[in-house]
């Protein structure tokens, strides 16, 4: 009797499961399409025909990011349909701060053993994020790597490319003393600070994923899995009618580390904390974890997802526009002169 030879499936890689997965995600991918997309899912590369006639001097802007340990929360709760939104948000929010309209997106999904239904839930979220951002999901990679991840675990990475007119690039160089700082509210923790949040909630407080968080009236899962807000359409709306001199996406590093990334030499940001009180989730984390103030503002977004430096005479109109766009926003401070060697963000 001839002994049966090994197959790839015997080694833990199920090509049939991969084909099932592709079939499940096709409608999600199609929902994100733009007229410039000239390829279908399954090709070796995604094709996007940029209409250069729309631009005088187009510059492509790229970004890549992940979701971090927020994925641990999704696995604990067995809820996988929102982390894809986070993935898109972390990438497109990074390029919109330079004024770039996101054009297309690609994802990387890695796991030990592919569960087609779970993977499809993730891609459904990616599709939703792309729709919110107005970009097309034109490709991706699904890597099944047996023995590399624990059962049920996976990781995500995202990649986006956008376009901006060279003359319209926002790089902070036009920020001047007296500019007002407009903060646009976050939807929650977004996708940063989860290692500390998990330590506080699950270790220090001893709560479970389905426990109701004190003072919030919602479960840990609901609070921690709130998707990251995508600011693309809001920012593009503002840029059509207002001068915006600099934008900071408040991600890992918080206000203290991200605002300086867009400040020119000689400028610092004065942030008035009474103008943007900590939302309840952040207050809970600070109190339960005895987290010092500066550590909070270096770890979490503390309720502010985007900071815009704008001319003083346009700040109030920008707030009115943001309110009309259903965004909570505040004037959280101003730009002041910074002496050499001084901190570039001052919390007052």
From Swiss-Prot:
- Give GO terms for biological process: 'de novo' IMP biosynthetic process; adenine biosynthetic process; purine nucleotide biosynthetic process
Provide this UniProt record's keywords sorted from A to Z.
ATP-binding, Cytoplasm, Ligase, Nucleotide-binding, Purine biosynthesis
Signal sequence, start to end: none
Q: Which SUPFAM superfamilies match?
A: PurM C-terminal domain-like, PurM N-terminal domain-like
UniProt enzyme class: ligase
Q: Which InterPro entries match?
A: PurM-like_C_dom, PurM-like_C_sf, PurM-like_N, PurM-like_N_sf, PurM_cligase
**Entry protein name:** Phosphoribosylformylglycinamidine cyclo-ligase
The scientific name of the source species is Geobacter sulfurreducens (strain ATCC 51573 / DSM 12127 / PCA)
Q: Which gene encodes it?
A: purM
């Amino acid at each position: 009797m001839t002994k049966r030879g090994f197959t790839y499936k015997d080694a833990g890689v199920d090509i049939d499961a991969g084909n099932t997965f592709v079939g499940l995600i096709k409608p999600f991918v199609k929902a994100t399409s733009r007229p410039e997309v000239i390829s279908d899912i399954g090709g070796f590369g995604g094709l996007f025909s940029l209409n250069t006639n729309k631009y005088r001097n187009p510059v492509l802007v790229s970004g890549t990011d992940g979701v971090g340990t927020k994925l641990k929360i999704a696995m604990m709760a067995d809820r996988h349909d929102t982390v894809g939104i986070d993935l898109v948000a972390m990438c497109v929010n990074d390029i919109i701060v330079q004024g770039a309209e996101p054009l297309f997106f690609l994802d990387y999904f890695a796991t030990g053993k592919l569960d087609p239904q779970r993977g499809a839930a993730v891609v459904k979220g990616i599709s939703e994020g792309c729709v919110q951002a107005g970009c097309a999901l034109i490709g991706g990679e699904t890597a099944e790597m047996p023995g590399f991840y624990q059962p049920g675990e996976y990781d995500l990475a995202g990649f986006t490319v956008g376009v901006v007119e060279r003359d319209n690039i926002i790089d902070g160089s036009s920020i001047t003393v007296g500019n007002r700082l407009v903060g646009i509210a976050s939807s929650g923790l977004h996708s940063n600070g989860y290692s500390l949040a998990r330590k506080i909630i699950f270790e220090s407080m001893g709560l479970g994923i389905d426990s109701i968080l004190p003072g919030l009236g919602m479960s840990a899962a609901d609070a921690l899995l709130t998707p990251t807000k995508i600011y693309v359409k809001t920012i593009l709306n503002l840029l059509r009618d207002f001068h915006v001199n600099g934008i900071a996406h408040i991600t890992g590093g918080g206000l203290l580390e991200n605002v300086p990334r867009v400040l020119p030499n000689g400028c610092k940001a004065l942030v008035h904390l009474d103008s943007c009180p900590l939302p309840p989730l952040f207050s809970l984390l600070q109190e339960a974890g005895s987290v010092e103030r500066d550590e909070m503002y270096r770890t979490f977004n503390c309720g502010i997802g985007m900071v815009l430096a704008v001319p003083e005479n346009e700040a109030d109109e920008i707030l009115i526009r943001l309110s009309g766009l259903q965004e909570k926003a505040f004037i959280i401070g101003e730009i002041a002169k910074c002496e050499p060697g001084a901190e570039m963000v001052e919390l007052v």
